[in-house]
A protein has these predicted regions:
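His/Glu-rich zincin catalytic helix
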Residues: 1-50, 81, 155, 164, ...
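Short, low-order "capping/linker" segments at domain edges
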Residues: 121-125, 221-235, 338-347
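M16 family metallopeptidases and their MPP-like homologs
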Residues: 2-22, 40-95, 99, 131-154, ...
Length: 361
């Protein structure tokens, strides 16, 4: 690749009351450091590094939340006069991580309040996307008090209540206590990359705490949850809990099964419920491998809800009984193989893939 990437992320158990802070911190850090105190100065510094970019990371990894930076930079092979773009970029990232301005015992108020507005807007955008909103509410209901049910950006109320002082105290705890995961994709010698990363954290006083192991969900009683809204099209989500997670030896078989059920346009749900019977506008299934959840989502007319429910259960039963054609099996396998091959298409895809695998353990 001509472009390399580095991700640096702190891992924390997903907790209510903390997830919003974890998501907010990287964006606040990217507002400025002492040597580049505003967005304009940061942009100029990155331009000098052959157009490198630094983006905030806030993502769910099973029971964990990852917060930090994703860095894209030019490979050293293409730099002028043997310049080390990697070394200089990581030096600047170190400043962004640890050399931030403070006031009154907290982050700069303008930085925090500005990023709170952005994060609240992102939270509310999920409400406007009814498919995403319905899926999140189903996961919250299905997971109960499990960490996987915690919204990764927090709630509006939680974010509004964050103060600059509270946020800085939380970040100091992250720096001190949280395990750090670093991923690099590029042509540099691994030993050299490791030394550069060690140098980044050389001045840190750390007492990292071991994270609890990823947990499995316990099946509960069936629940129905409804929310009335002024919308033209209803969103039906159905969640099914399986005993097969990405830590199970049957993981690959479960991926294939989900593909057959509702993974794409060749699936049972799409072909039978949407195409043949015209019962919905859209339908598909997703496999949340960290918890073994299969989630079916459909856009429907309100008067067709019961019919769609029955048909979803009928197609699921067909999979359970082995009523799967050779064509359905081949199509699901091919879709998964195509997705796996595409991992090697870009540094970002490789970083995301290996990061997810490592943190799932």
């Amino acid at each position: 690749f001509k472009q390399n990437c580095v991700s640096i992320q702190y891992l924390r158990e997903m907790r209510r009351g903390e997830s919003g802070k974890n998501a907010l911190i990287p964006s606040v850090l990217l507002r400025g450091c002492k040597s580049a105190p505003d967005l304009r100065q940061i942009t100029l510094r990155l331009d000098d590094l052959y157009g490198a970019s630094v983006s905030p990371i806030s993502r769910r990894a099973g029971d964990y939340q990852a917060s930090g930076f994703y860095v894209s930079l030019m490979d050293d092979r293409f730099a002028l006069e043997g310049e080390s773009v990697l070394e200089k970029t990581l030096d600047f990232v170190t400043e962004l991580l640890f050399d931030y301005p403070t006031e009154d015992g907290g982050f700069l108020k303008d930085f925090v309040e500005g990023e709170k507005i952005n994060q609240i807007a992102a939270i509310e955008s999920e409400l406007n996307d009814k498919r995403v909103y319905a899926a999140q509410k189903l996961l919250e209901t299905l997971c109960g008090q499990d960490p996987y049910g915690v919204p990764k950006m927090g709630t509006r109320q939680e974010v509004e209540a964050i103060t600059p002082q509270e946020l800085l105290r939380h970040y100091e705890a992250l720096r001190r206590e949280s395990p750090v995961e670093v991923y690099y994709v590029g042509s540099a010698d691994p030993g050299r990359v490791a030394e550069l990363v060690k140098r980044m954290f050389a001045q840190e006083v750390r007492e990292p705490r071991e994270l609890p192991r990823q947990t499995d969900l316990t099946p509960g009683v069936r629940q129905d949850r409804r929310e009335a809204m002024e919308v033209a099209q209803g969103k039906l989500c159905m969640g099914f809990l399986t005993p097969i997670t990405n830590r199970d030896h049957r993981f690959a078989a479960m991926q294939v099964t989900n593909g057959i059920l509702g993974g794409d346009v060749t699936s049972k749900l799409f072909q039978n419920v949407r195409e043949k019977q015209s019962l919905c506008y859209s339908i598909g299934s997703g496999y949340y491998a960290a918890k073994g959840i299969v989630l079916v989502s459909a856009g429907i007319d309100f008067d067709k809800e019961d019919h769609v429910r029955r048909e979803v259960l009928s197609q699921l039963e067909g999979c359970q009984l082995g009523q799967i054609t050779d064509e359905e099996l081949a199509a699901s396998k091919q879709s998964l193989l195509t997705a796996l091959r595409s991992v090697q298409d870009s540094p970002s895809a490789m970083e995301n893939y290996y990061s997810a695998i490592t943190m799932a353990q």
